[in-house]
Every structure is written in C-alpha cells, then in structure tokens.
Design a protein with these regions (language model features):
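C-terminal motif of bacterial Sec signal peptides marking the signal peptidase cleavage site
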Residues: 19-23
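Low-complexity, acidic/polar, glycine-enriched regions of mature
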Residues: 25-228
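Gram-negative bacterial Sec-dependent N-terminal signal peptides
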Residues: 9-17
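Bacterial N-terminal signal peptides that target proteins for export
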Residues: 1-10
Length: 228
C-alpha cells in the first residue's frame, strides 16, 4: 500500500512539474514582439533639379501655434510668404531625402492686422517694408534623415535659422501620398508632405514677449506637382 501511495505521489509531482514548465514557456512566448510592420514604396521626387517637378505654393502653408500669455489657449497664425529652395525625396532611402525652405517673418498672419503689422513686427525685430534681408528670413535646412521605427515617417535633424540664431533641431517628416490629377497630356502626379517640429522661442532664439509661451509648434504642409 505504501508503495502504491509513493507511486501516485511521484506521478502527481511529474504532472505538476510538466504543467509548470509549459506555463512558463507559454508566458515567455507572449512577451516577445516584432514591432509594427512598416511598408515603404519607391516614390522619388527632386525639386528643383527635375524640370517636371514644381512647388505648388498656393496649396502649401506654414502654420505656428503657442500658448497665449504662456499658458492659456493657443494663439495661432501662418506665414503668407514662403518658398522651397530644394526638396529631394526617396521614399525607401533616408539618404536620398533633403530639403531647404524659408518664410518671410514679417508676413506673419494671425487674422488681426493691427497685431500682425504692429507688436509682432517689433517682437521679431523686423519691419513691414523688409523683403529678402537676412533678418526677415527664417530658414529650415535638413542635415540628416533617418527612417522612423514607429511608422513610415522620417526623423529629420535640421538647422533652424531665425532671429539671428541658428540652432539644430529634430522634426518629423511624413509623406502624405500621391494623387493623379488630369488625364493625357495634362496628367500630373500631386505629392503631399507634412513636416512638424517645436522650438524654444525665448530660450534659444532670444524672443522677448509676455504674450507667448517659450514653446512654439510649427507645421509645414508642402505640395508638389510632377508632369508625367
């Protein structure tokens, strides 16, 4: 009888040990992950070296936002005069992506003419009569680009030149897709891109104002057209 009891006890120990091992290995399998599946195409774009590509300024824009009085609801605006010096894009190759763009600072537009042509001109250190003077131009110029590991975007290190200061920042570039317009001889590929970043206007660029927060967000939307 004792021998029978010992045999049963031994069998139970073996069963329990096997169950515990299988449970542990099953849990370990659940922990592992391969991350998001990121797919990239083969689209390429070269402005201004490709004569078939043009920058569609009418449907592009540069907007900004910052907390009013440093901590309230957002004060927003845009720049009415902007341009693209160059833009190169290779969807699957980060080394083939680079760009340079600019805005005229004195063409700020918050839908309040008195503010736009008054206190903001003083804050930026410009006048309404300026055009291509260095003090009136804010420039972004890419330095390096990496493929994002979270989505199909691109992480961009770039220089922002503004208010007499040049500082390296990091932003996010998104390829918004391509749509074909027209047909036959008038057919065009229309490309869309979004570039977003933030900067410290007071700390890094010497802006003096109690009306805005230090942190300013920028969103650039760019459209290009390519004849087929």
């Amino acid at each position: 009888m004792r021998l029978y009891n010992k045999a049963c006890l031994f069998a139970l120990v073996i069963l329990f040990s096997g169950y515990a091992y299988m449970s542990c290995t099953h849990k370990d399998a659940l922990v592992s992950t391969n991350g998001p599946k990121i797919e990239r195409g083969t689209h390429k774009l070269n402005f201004i070296t490709d004569p078939k590509v043009s920058f569609d300024k009418q449907h592009s824009n540069v907007g900004w936002e910052t907390a009013y009085l440093g901590g309230l609801s957002l004060l927003t605006g845009r720049f009415d005069t902007l341009g693209m010096t160059s833009f190169n894009f290779d969807e699957s190759n980060a080394a083939g992506i680079s760009f340079e763009a600019w805005v005229w600072v004195n063409r700020v537009n918050t839908s309040e003419p008195a503010r736009d042509k008054g206190c903001l001109q003083t804050t930026y250190g410009v006048t309404t009569s300026m055009t291509t003077e260095a003090a009136n131009i804010a420039i972004i110029k890419s330095k390096s680009v990496e493929l994002s590991t979270d989505d199909n975007g691109y992480i961009v290190k770039f220089d922002l030149t503004f208010h007499g200061v040049t500082k390296e920042l990091t932003g996010k570039l998104l390829y918004d897709g391509t749509i074909v317009t027209g047909s036959g001889a008038t057919a065009k590929n229309v490309y869309g891109f979004t570039f977003t970043f933030q900067f410290l206007a007071k700390t890094d660029f010497g802006i003096v104002s109690t009306n805005i927060a230090d942190l300013v967000g920028i969103k650039c939307n760019a459209i290009f057209r390519q004849t087929q």
